[in-house]
Amino acid sequence: MDNVKAKTVIRQLISLLPIDVHQRLLFDHYTKKLTTMKAIMLFINAQLKQWSSYGEMEIALRAEPKLQQLLQLESISGSQLSRKLDQIPTELLEWMFQHLASQTQQRACHQGQSGKLHIIDSSSIRLPLQLGSWAKMSNKSSGVKMHLRLVVTAPDKLFPDAMIPSSLNVGDRAGAVELVVPSDAIYVMDRGYDDYARMDQWVQDNIQFVIRMRDRALATVIEEYPVPEGSNITRDAKVCVGSSFRSMEHSVRLVEFYDEQERTYRIFTSVWDKTAEEIAQIYKNRWLIELYFKWLKQHLRLKKLHSHKPQAIWNQLFLALITALLVEHIRHSTQTAKTNWQVLRILREYLYRSWRSFRIELDRKPSRSSPGRRPGSGPKVLSVRTMVGIIKPSKFKE
């Protein structure tokens, strides 16, 4: 990227997309100003900057000459943006997302870090009952789900490569149908994905999985394996899962262990070439997808939706994931030691500045380091430097 230092950061990001921002697509036949790709780029800007509404996007475009120059668009109304978000073909955004994910996967393979784990889970986003009646789950809840597959090549190197949006009443099992496909990776799932018929099919297709089972799941021991002394593993066995009413045809492996809080976990797996300790550690990595969902909702525009129409919501979900992959690409290409959140924070401030100034800030070393004041090293002093306000002495002593 350094061979085009004169470019702004936003132009660098645009160059990563598989379609030119000024290209008119088939869907733009009758469009005069806001073409599909211009709208997509504007919504990616909204994700990066966390613009909260169509009105804020409208003002931001009028206020930023470099964004106007980039999009060749001086202004656009919030109502036009609202209509456009619902008109963008979701299949186009899904293809762009998969293109970026494929590039990320190729970089990982070149480094010898192909996807070792594929973590499957879903996260819900609530909708107002009055506006989200099409996604009602009960008289008190309405919303949508993001069913996600997260590729983990290392604890600090992970990225999404597949996503299925759905209404809130779609179960996790249904969402996993298209997310679990033949692969060399190990699929990691929590309770809620324990479908015996599907697990049988995975075993038959040589798909490796590690699933936490519900406590009520029945397992008949076929063969017990020795458990290492002094470890947190309490059982390692070959079992037959289910009862006479409903059961699996193929046998699987049962690994039981407890964590630091003495909580017990029952894991069913089709992986036989790893130790019980390794199986337990693989399942513990499932927490990474929880952290990833939290990162998306905190740092991108995902927790609060711009629209309450199905296609517009699906589009916003894919736009958030596309933005996350762009941030990951910048972090990888610059070879910075900073986290994705640190890179995103700098991107926000330097989005319309030169790439060179962004790199200077990204590579900047702390001016000085200090261990800080040690706890309890000095007396506690209540500092009040104003006559405004009332403080009543507390009766309670520390």
Language model features with spans:
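Extracellular beta-strand-rich solenoid/capping regions of secreted or surface-exposed proteins
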Residues: A135-N139
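Short boundary motifs at domain starts and secondary-structure transition points
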Residues: R107-Q111
